[in-house]
Amino acid sequence: MDIVKVCPELHIVMDVDSGLIAEMRKDILVVDLHPVEDEINKLAQYAKALENSLDPRNSPMKAYNGREGTYKLAGMFQGMFFGFWVTMAILVLVTILAVKMNLSLIGL
């Protein structure tokens, strides 16, 4: 919101956006909210990107074209990775338990 002082001696100003001419008062503070609105729009864009990241079919916000399904692929590999290590831990525990129960398996 821009204002122009039409007559500084009489404290008369004009609003550039609306063309309204009015008396300038000292008890009213005029604040430009365009920077705040820009920040709110940026936060809304980030919120939309976060919401889209919950759907594995969407691509990340600043990804190159053709990156749809990145989250789906990452989720699949994450499940395979942790599944492998959990299976290996269970296998080691079963092996240790089997050896403890029957020591003849290792020749003792």
Curated annotation (Swiss-Prot):
A GO cellular component annotated for this chain's UniProt record is:
plasma membrane
Task: Answer whether the UniProt record assigns the keyword Methyltransferase to this protein.
Answer: yes
**Coiled coil (UniProt feature):** none
Annotated InterPro entries: MtrB_MeTrfase
BP terms from Gene Ontology: methanogenesis, from carbon dioxide; methylation; one-carbon metabolic process
Cellular location of this protein?
Cell membrane
Q: Which reaction does it catalyse?
A: 5-methyl-5,6,7,8-tetrahydromethanopterin + coenzyme M + 2 Na(+)(in) = 5,6,7,8-tetrahydromethanopterin + methyl-coenzyme M + 2 Na(+)(out)
Enzyme's top EC category? translocase
Task: Please give the Pfam families that the UniProt record associates with this protein.
Answer: MtrB (PF05440)
Instruction: Tell me where the transmembrane regions lie.
Output: 79-99
A GO molecular-function term, please?
Answer: tetrahydromethanopterin S-methyltransferase activity
Q: In which pathway does it act?
A: One-carbon metabolism; methanogenesis from CO(2); methyl-coenzyme M from 5,10-methylene-5,6,7,8-tetrahydromethanopterin: step 2/2
Does this UniProt record's set of keywords contain Membrane?
A: yes
Q: How does the entry describe its membrane topology?
A: Single-pass membrane protein
Cysteine-cysteine disulfides: none
Q: What is its EC number?
A: 7.2.1.4
- Keyword set, alphabetical order: Cell membrane, Membrane, Methanogenesis, Methyltransferase, One-carbon metabolism, Transferase, Translocase, Transmembrane, Transmembrane helix
What HAMAP family does the entry give? MtrB
Subunit composition and interactions: The complex is composed of 8 subunits; MtrA, MtrB, MtrC, MtrD, MtrE, MtrF, MtrG and MtrH.
Its function, per the record, reads: Part of a complex that catalyzes the formation of methyl-coenzyme M and tetrahydromethanopterin from coenzyme M and methyl-tetrahydromethanopterin. This is an energy-conserving, sodium-ion translocating step.
The record's comment on protein family reads: Belongs to the MtrB family.
The protein here is known as: Tetrahydromethanopterin S-methyltransferase subunit B
